Swiss-Prot record:
It comes from Oldenlandia affinis. One of its GO terms (biological process) is killing of cells of another organism. Belongs to the cyclotide family. Moebius subfamily. Kalata-B2 is a cyclic peptide which occurs in three forms: with unmodified Trp, with Trp oxidized to form N-formylkynurenine and with Trp oxidized to form kynurenine. Oxidation is enhanced by exposure to sunlight. Keywords: Cytolysis, Disulfide bond, Hemolysis, Knottin, Plant defense, Repeat, Signal. This is Kalata-B2. Residues 23-66, 96-120, 150-174, 204-210 form a propeptide. It holds the Pfam family Cyclotide.
């Protein structure tokens, strides 16, 4: 766990460095560095057999720190409505983060999360629905994106990551704690969660196969 924490801290520092001094890098250099950060985080997450919620939390946190577009909507029509994302069927992936042979990117991590949720029989929504319809069974159009029929509406606009966060919140309502808040003080306010610095993780949850 110490190894994971050290790698995480280093990765987050690198992410902040890219954000602060990105202007001094070429686009190719920035893409390579970001890819390395994402790949290192994924290796540590899967190496420690983390939960799907933790994978999702780390994906979103790492992407948000850099201010890069978070893709993930389906692209059955062949296009992506999120700026900076391109269609790599069946989901959208970020333009600036190329895939490496033998290596996984953050998009792959998110795709694994979506696939795992689908294998559990719960529809994963998030594709855009500018045409007014959703291709995923069990999802309805809440413009501009699809949301699961059984999920409550949220105030304001929705993004793909907001939809997935609502899914986690729905799980919490069913008695499963949703962790992910920061715990710089060493404690977690959510019952059933423990501090795995710098974020809270669930005390016990079926594990994702590495």
């Amino acid at each position: 766990m110490a190894k994971f924490t050290n790698c995480l801290v280093l990765s987050l520092l690198l992410a902040a460095f890219v954000g602060a001094f990105g202007a001094e890098f070429s686009e190719a250099d920035k893409a390579t560095l970001v890819n390395d950060i994402a790949e290192n985080i994924q290796k540590e997450i899967l190496g420690e057999v983390k939960t799907s919620e933790t994978v999702l939390t780390m994906f979103l946190k790492e992407m948000q720190l850099k201010g890069l577009p978070v893709c993930g909507e389906t692209c059955f029509g062949g296009t992506c409505n999120t700026p900076g994302c391109s269609c790599t069927w069946p989901i959208c992936t970020r333009d600036s983060l190329p895939m490496r042979a033998g290596g996984k990117t953050s998009e792959t991590t998110l795709h694994m999360f979506l696939k795992e949720m689908q294998l559990k029989g719960l529809p994963v929504c998030g594709e855009t629905c500018f045409g007014g319809t959703c291709n995923t069974p069990g999802c309805s159009c809440t413009w501009p994106i699809c949301t699961r029929d059984s999920l409550p509406m949220s105030a304001g606009g929705k993004t793909s990551e907001t939809t997935l966060h609502m899914f986690l919140k729905e799980m919490q309502l069913k008695g499963l704690p949703v962790c992910g808040e920061t715990c710089f003080g060493g404690t977690c306010n959510t019952p059933g969660c423990s501090c795995t610095w710098p974020i809270c993780t669930r005390d016990s949850l079926p594990l994702v196969a590495a």
